[in-house]
UniProtKB/Swiss-Prot annotation:
One of its GO terms (molecular function) is polyubiquitin modification-dependent protein binding. CDD domains: Abraxas_1 (cd23523). One of its GO terms (cellular component) is BRCA1-A complex. The modification Phosphoserine is found at S388. Belongs to the FAM175 family. Abraxas subfamily. It comes from the Eukaryota. This is BRCA1-A complex subunit Abraxas 1. It comes from Danio rerio. Component of the ARISC complex. Component of the BRCA1-A complex. Homodimer. Involved in DNA damage response and double-strand break (DSB) repair. Component of the BRCA1-A complex, acting as a central scaffold protein that assembles the various components of the complex. The BRCA1-A complex specifically recognizes 'Lys-63'-linked ubiquitinated histones H2A and H2AX at DNA lesion sites. This complex also possesses deubiquitinase activity that specifically removes 'Lys-63'-linked ubiquitin on histones H2A and H2AX. A motif (pSXXF motif) lies at residues 388-391.
């Protein structure tokens, strides 16, 4: 029984370089992939099967060469130019080309018809028939645009169709596979032991571990802890922003409904205005304090601002003002006592100038009388002097 498995292996450095180059460009990016193709054949013998052959085909991506623009090595109909590929490769050989890549924004992880035609024409020109097509599709992870997502996949031509093959990132796997970098070997040789003992103090700590590697590992753990804290904070802020955006969307939708259907949201205007509510306690208090003034118990005024006596309140509300508002009655009695002497003083003050006028008139009359009397006396004296004989 035979099995054929194909995988693509790429390092984190090359993948990050692809991402960096794509994010720094405003349009889609494409280019060539350089590397090597390795094939292995494993034969297993089990109780159920005498021979179990498994072919492992691994495509190791080592480098990528980006093109300056789209359609750099093919035409609008998908015809690939070998001369343009050599110009892009420059000092590299065609044997090192194991495929090409394309980066599209906000699209699906699926080959288009144009990409399938280009890939088929490249297989005809290049010597390596097992070409791989790598597709990278970045998109926004959240509505606010603070988190981005990058999906990548690889396709090869197999059995008259394009199939998706798995991609393995070498330094993003299980960290337990790299423990031998920090731990010394269990059975060292004699020469190795002598060399290590000679320089042990410089590179190794007391636990037979590499000092620099342990420090780097501790720093890595601290950075991971800080990154986890930042991730939690970013997640909380993202939830808050999403909630605010939902509220804003609901408000916009409500405003749009009000603009499109204003009749539904308008309050119906009644034909006749509501009658004002009567303050029965105030009406009873005014009736008690001013029983002879009915104009104070009306709520309707004329155009000129005069109360309408026909609409005054004449109903008895059966409210005892002496128990409800006892202070009003006390103030009323005290005012009556205080206002009586004030009226007398006012009358006295009002009659005082009349008396002064009368006194002034009598004085003027007496003065005029005295003046007239003195004049008559002088005249009489003059007459008596003139009639007397002169000797």
């Amino acid at each position: 029984m035979e099995e054929f498995n194909t995988t693509v292996r790429i390092s984190g450095f090359v993948l990050s370089s692809l991402m960096f180059h794509h994010l720094n460009s405003d349009a889609d990016v494409e280019g060539l992939i350089l590397g090597e193709s390795v094939g292995e054949e494993n034969c297993r013998i089990t109780d159920s099967q005498i021979d179990h052959i498994q072919f492992e085909h691994t495509l190791n991506i080592q480098k990528h060469i980006p093109c300056h623009k789209l359609h750099s090595f093919y035409s609008n109909v998908g015809d690939v130019s070998e001369q343009k590929i050599r110009q892009i490769l420059s000092d590299y050989k065609e044997e090192n080309v194991i495929g090409w890549y394309r980066q599209r924004r906000n699209t699906r992880q699926q080959m288009t018809f144009m990409e399938q035609v280009i890939h088929r024409n490249m297989r005809k020109i290049l010597s390596n028939q097992e070409l791989v097509f790598m597709l990278l599709t970045p998109s926004q992870g959240t509505a606010s645009g603070s988190t981005h997502r990058l999906e990548f996949s690889a396709f090869i031509w197999h059995s008259s169709q394009y199939i998706n093959i798995p991609i393995s990132v070498s330094n993003l796997g299980n960290l337990e596979q790299q423990d031998y970098w920090r731990v010394s070997s269990t059975c060292p040789s004699l020469g190795q032991s002598q060399a290590v003992n000679q320089h042990r103090a410089k590179f190794f700590c007391s636990g037979d571990d590499l000092r620099e590697v342990r420090n780097v590992s501790d720093m890595n753990d601290a950075l991971l802890a800080e990154m986890q804290k930042v991730c939690v904070e970013v997640e909380k802020s993202e939830r808050t922003v999403e909630k605010l955006q939902e509220d804003i969307a609901q408000l916009k939708e409500a405003i749009g409904k009000q603009k499109t259907h204003p009749e539904e949201h308008e309050t119906p205007i009644s034909a006749c205005p509501e009658e004002p509510k009567e303050n029965t306690l105030l009406c009873s208090a005014l009736r008690t304090l001013f029983p002879s003034v009915p104009s104070l118990r009306t709520q309707t005024l004329t155009v000129h601002g005069f109360p309408v006596l026909q609409l005054c309140c004449n109903t008895d509300h059966n409210i005892d003002i002496s128990t409800k508002l006892p202070q009003i009655l006390e103030n009323q009695h005290s005012r009556r006592k205080v206002t009586a002497p004030r009226l007398r003083k006012k009358c006295l003050v009002a009659s005082f100038p009349q008396r002064l006028k009368r006194k002034r008139k009598t004085r003027e009359v007496s003065e005029s009388a005295s003046e007239s009397g003195s004049d008559t006396e002088i005249e009489m004296n003059g007459q008596s002097g003139s009639n007397s004989p002169v000797f």
